[in-house]
Amino acid sequence: MLFNVCCKDTEELYETPIVQQTAFWSDVKAQLGAGTLGVNFKARQSDLFYRSTEDKTIISSDILAVIRQIDCYHSIAYIPYGPELEPSEEFQGMFLEELSESIRPFLPKDCILIRYDLCWQSYWAKDEEHFDENGIWKGQPDSLSQEFRFNFNTHRWNFKKAYFNILPSNTIYLDLTQDADAILRKMKSKTRYNIRLSARKGVEVKTMGLDGLDIWYELYKETAARNHLFLNDIKYFEAVLRAKTDTSRSPADVRLLIAEWEGMPLAAMFLVMTANRGSYLYGASSSQHRNLMPTYALQWEAIQLSKANGCTEYDMFGISPSPDPSHPLYGLYKFKAGFGGEIYHSLGCWDYPLDEEKYALFRVSEINSQGYHLS
């Protein structure tokens, strides 16, 4: 199925809308002390896609793997939102199994598993039976049911559903191919009202770089404390702003947007534009003057910037799987769904153990660890 599997310089990673599979992201992780690995591979279209048995087209693709040390003696290979290449459902497990075995020789000897944080669409998001009478998604089934379906056609039946997803597995994509008025019309009336209210009240959004890092971090600390979130060090965000963005085959355009009112920072966000997609990566806001709707001003500015820079879609990056008020991300769902767009559910994190015994111990230890990180 796969051939010409080889390492490649991460600077040569192919252009992609997936931020976490770019040379830019490799540089971010390298600045933070992680190892990164680029792997190139080829496949025939007929081996990957249903009803393409006569198509001999050769597909060339790649992945970025981040090597994460979990202790002094063991590491894992984490593949954030990769691979981008998404075969037909019946070939996915087989493809990923062969890819795992093909990249095994390139990984450190202490690597005990490969973790794919898949952006592939969830099988159950394509199934009408998994939506209720109101069109609300019921979510993924239990892990055993997921594993049974995912391992279809594999030789080793080796894939395990991770206990939690690291990157968001539910998001909303906005279509930016239409004009600004059409984009606004697709929003909920309350969202349009709040965007216009923030403008009337004098909220202004400006673009900053490293000079805005301290402003961002103060807002971020306030947000983390208010919502009981894990607090990342300022060096994490500094790495995002310092990373090389335009010297590779997969460039990125990073903007730190700050919403202000009368010179007072009220909200901030990181916008990253890669290929045809703008992505809302991180956000923070003050508890003061929330009635001025600065977060709405930020999102509208990010949407307009993305469109102006040639993006055809905008990723809202992370919501609850359904409008369930008891879910910790329900507030994000309610806010982001107001901007219109299509809800997308992905498969999330899947593990391919390289050392079964050590992997079993790792899973036990992971149950008690914090399950949501910036990665």
PLM region spans:
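Active-site/acyl-donor-binding loops of N-acyltransferases
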Residues: 2-14, 22, 43-49, 121, ...
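A conserved beta-strand-loop-helix scaffold within acyl/acetyltransferase catalytic domains
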Residues: 2-73, 120-123, 128, 139-141, ...
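Phosphate-centric recognition/catalysis
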Residues: 79
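Conserved glycine-rich acetyl-CoA-binding loop
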Residues: 85-94, 286-294
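Short secondary-structure subsegments characteristic of cysteine-rich extracellular domains
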Residues: 91-110
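Aromatic (often tryptophan-rich) hydrophobic motifs at membrane interfaces
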Residues: 101, 242-361
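Short acidic/polar active-site loop segments enriched in Thr and Asp
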Residues: 109-112, 312
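Acidic beta-strand-to-loop metal/phosphate-binding motif
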Residues: 111-119
